[in-house]
Amino acid sequence: MIAIIAVLVSLLLPAVQAAREAARRSQCVNNLKQIGLALHGYLDTNGTFCLGQFVTTTPRGQVNISSWTLGLAPYLEQKALFDSWNFGFNFAEPKNTTGSQIAVGVYHCPSSPSPAVADFTATYDMAGVTTGSKFRSASVDYAASANSTIILDSAGAAAHGVISYTVGGNPATFAAVTDGLSNTISFLEMAGGPTLYGPKRTPINIAGLPWTAMGHVGGINRISLRGWSYDGLVQYGGNCVVNCNNGGGSLYGFHPGGANVALCDGSVRFLKQTIAATTMHKLVSRAQGEILSADDL
């Protein structure tokens, strides 16, 4: 009898696990839909899409960078987070301890192993945060689609995405998305931080990665699309753009076979990890005039 029960459990367990992951993936999709709707709320109010980073200069002359996660907070019923943030100080300073540790459910994918609040370490100097600085912050499993460097134009420039992140850059307008809202990614999964993961959701270690301005509520949280090697160890080392590395430059989700993206029309798609890098480039760029076919996806 015990042996029979053990066999039944072994047969049922995969089905139970699959059902649980389906529920988690559904919530992850819903999170991206809410973020996409918040982006349109921002667009309706401000006339442009949200910037990927907000830049302020303090009386000390220090340039501070804050994330789209703060810019969209009021449109996600998270005004308390926005109001608690002191934009005159960087995300790692004590003045922003309270705000940086406010965990926002919609920014966390339940399939991700990221804790609600995690310990981060800066891996190089940026925006007043020095290498080795340690701080605690709420984690974020989604990133803005900023640009693609997989295919450069004749001048060697990257293709612009819909969420501008260049310091001092201009935010994109509705009219600037000439490739079509349903063909252009706004946000995507980049889950698992601050731990660095490679293929098959295996933790890896690469010196200098990830830059921990990504993955937490006060950081940049954007993707400049570039191909990774299929072992997840080399940037610009191949054509893997889904689930090879979560240190920036590609999508990364903890769902079997792929990751989710939000499109500018508010819809969400699941992209397979076998997707071609050139197809991802088309989806990231907002005004390159590329043609997407059903076969591409």
List the model feature ranges, each with a label.
Residues 7, 22-297:
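Surface-exposed loop/linker segments characteristic of extracytoplasmic
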Residues 12-15, 19, 31:
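Extended, hydrophobic alpha-helical segments in both membrane/secreted and soluble proteins
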Residues 2-14:
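Alpha-helical hydrophobic helix detector
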